[in-house]
Amino acid sequence: MAAANVSVVIPARNAAETLAEAIESLQAQTLTGWEAVVVEDGSTDETAELARALARTDSRIVVVDGAGRGVSAARNAGIERARYPLLAFLDADDLIRPTLYEHATARLERDAALAGVHCGWARLAPGGEIVDAVPAKIEGDLFTEFARHCLFPIHACVVRTDLVRSAGAFDERLTTCEDWDLWLRVTRYGRPFAAIQAVLALYRMRPRSASLDAPRLLADGLGVIAQARRPDPRVQGPVAHERGLASDDLAVNGLNHACWTAGLAIGSGVDPEPLLDAVRSTAPIPAEPLVMAGCLFASTVLPRCLTPADWTGLADELRDPIDSFLTSAEEVARLPGLASRVWRRLEEKILAASPRGVTTRIGTSAALDIEVTEPLADIEVADGVERLVCRIALEGEPFGVLGLPACDGLLPGAVLADAIAGELGWSLLTRFLTGSTLPSLALRDRGTHLEVVRGSTPVGRVPPGTQLGPAVLNGPVGWAVFLQELFDRPEWPPEWFYHPPRPSRHGRPRSEATVELSGEISPMTPAPANPAVVMTLGGAPLGLVTVQCRDGGVAPERLVAHAVRSAGVELALVAVREALVGRPLRSGGALRARLQAAAEREGAETAAPHELVLARRQPLDIGGPASRSYALPVGAASELLESARATDEPVVKDGSFHTHVRYAPELIPALPVVPAPSRAPLRRRLLARARVRRTSSATQVTRELPILMYHRVDESGAEALARYRITPARFEEHLRYLRDEGFRSVTFGELGEAMRLRRPLPGRCVLVTFDDGCADFLEHAQPLLAQYGFTATLFVVTDRVGATNSWDAAYGDVVELLDWDALRELTAAGVAIGSHSATHPYLTSLSSADVVREAARSRAAIARELGVAPVALAYPYGDVDAIVRHLAGGCGYPYAVTTEGRHAALTDNRLALPRIEVPGWFTALDLADLLNGPRL
């Protein structure tokens, strides 16, 4: 590749105020080999003179006359003049940071298959503040992304020149969305893009920008969205996406784009409702409230050149026009409750972005500022507040945002601490270990990799070139160091915590069935065969662990190994909660000493007056939602009690009425015959089943699990719901492909085991799910599943079992649903049954009490009718947010699935597992693309 390898096209019209600064950002590039083609496009100010003056001082700059034909024609003139194989665009009022072209060209030189490289970007406010930073994370084939929205601004990408030319360059008929249209055509080839996460491109906010013309933006954008769903004759040569995408999502993406332009109109003081005329549909639109809220949130402030933090002062002013627009959008979408769902998401975004230190309330949502190193007490909230946006800070710096319900005017400190540990625990632990343990680590060059050592003990490996910094602790190395610190065994390599060396018999024998892991662990002698041991950490019970007894006892090393294998990453979360949350990081001693001090503290009372306490579920399953703390609405107490009775789960009641409901995972049993030690009191008894574990001899492993989502298997049905219906022949084609490619079925329990230990599933795995519980599952799907050796999870709407799918009535597709007898037959045949709620509502539109009623009533019905609790919850329509997710865990669901279309990672939240929808028209080849395509 030539030394000067990037041609940078800069259209300039009346840009005398900003052109020099844009050129300066180009001249500051660490890659010096570039040329700038400045296309002067009929300016009436001094732009032309300035451009020529700049060219006289730098031979890499050339000036071309654009004749005032518009920005697309100007860029095309620059493309025609470009001499180099790599191409970039830079508007005359935007900026790039110094390393953009160096990093991008290096990636393109290393990988000839790449079409381009894009980077993170941010907006530059008039006052010079950098706001709305968007790191670049998405890589690979980006056609599907651009078919929905414009992924990045034009100057945040370096692309191969020949691809832009063969794609037809810019469409000069477009006055807006011309860059989106070009990227869509370039990505139609299917060649991958790489991403540089760092923010290296700055987009200047301008009050009179063409990108703020709402009607024009809507018309042009809808044209781009539609073009993505049909062939494009402008693109030359063979392309991967010749026919474009299916058109079934055209309406929903059009509505999303209408929300973006509506925000521009609202921010400009213009009535946005006429914009909806362009996206009216004859059928209901499956709207995306989160995307709609995101569009309104991002675009409404742009006409005023404001930042997201300014929303706090705008919310009251703009509530009426936003309300009016969303009410009309709900009518257009024919989707009751849509307006409230979008508003809730918008409230969350506004509160998360509002200035810290200001307690803000919008509707039923309120913001709280939480400093993680300060003690966490119970927080009383104002009447009417149901949803809390908790803005978490660590030593005064923003650290994360959590969404939690405020049930009956209270957020218990224990629930908040547990949520912080559950959502942000690993980041907090890494920060602590960086200060306490990182200095003891060193790197050794082993040729193919670098070995991380602590003293003389290897603790992991990292790629060549890795620097010894905090990032080293974000993975297996950090996990190994944590275990060494927790058990005070810095000389143990990681594998010894799972398979210890020859056990010692040193230490005072003990017979108690409780082991505090931060203290001295002595042999258990004598011990019954395979005793159930209560493991505690910092005085907090983790759960029951069944240990293997040898020679009448259990050695300390084996107790450590059992704890690590049984609790997995829950050890880290509990250690963070008990030793770090609510305490200063820079004082207080080492992690183990902090936990020992916590173990000596007195425990809380079992139940406060008039408090209904639900005790620990599934004590043998450590680390899932059953290990978290929840506050639940007292308005749903009867449904929660019904669910507990149906599943034979213990309840602690106090008084004849209740003012609060709490799920307390610390209430774990001891064995009836064994007394509990004084410093880790046990408050209840509970029987539990052991898990059944599968093994596989396969050498291949699955690190990211595809969870497939089907609905119906039948020959006919309403055309509007064709994507949710697959014919038996095509479904058999899918199963045959899975069998022939060596896939095997796994259960949610197996996935949970892998997630707890962060260890891949053995073999090539898939998890098959069906939503709704249609009667055709028994007739068509189950026989084929059995024939090809697969199992499935069936999610049923319990109030509609034996009836019809009333939620699809608007589409004219009345389908019979399985009755309880059929579900019992399927359960006996090995089909796992999950909940799809009681009535199939949009859960985010409901109050907290109604969410719990839906989830708990459905769970109780399945347990009562089938004799087993549902294995998981499938959120109806995939409609979920942080509040719904939290409440689902509190109702007792160990897993929950969404409709987010990607593979499930071992680090995913168990209550927000993604699923890959399989449309009815997908062939086995299409399924192969789904399974083998981009993972995250």
Predicted regions and their residues:
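Short, basic/aromatic recognition patches
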Residues: 356-389, 498-532
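Cysteine/selenocysteine-centered motifs that mediate thiol-based redox chemistry or coordinate metal-sulfur cofactors
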Residues: 425-511, 568-650
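Nucleotide-sugar donor-binding/catalytic module of glycosyltransferases
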Residues: 1-223
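A short, conserved beta-to-alpha structural element at the edge of catalytic cores
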Residues: 203, 789-810
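C-terminal subregions of glycosyltransferases and related glycan-biosynthesis enzymes
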Residues: 207-363, 369-378, 389-450, 455, ...
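C-terminal active-site subregion of NodB/CE4 polysaccharide deacetylases
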Residues: 684-769, 774-777, 845-936
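Acidic (Asp/Glu)-rich catalytic clusters
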Residues: 783-789, 816-834
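Membrane-proximal basic amphipathic "stem/tether" segments
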Residues: 297-350, 648, 652-704, 920-936
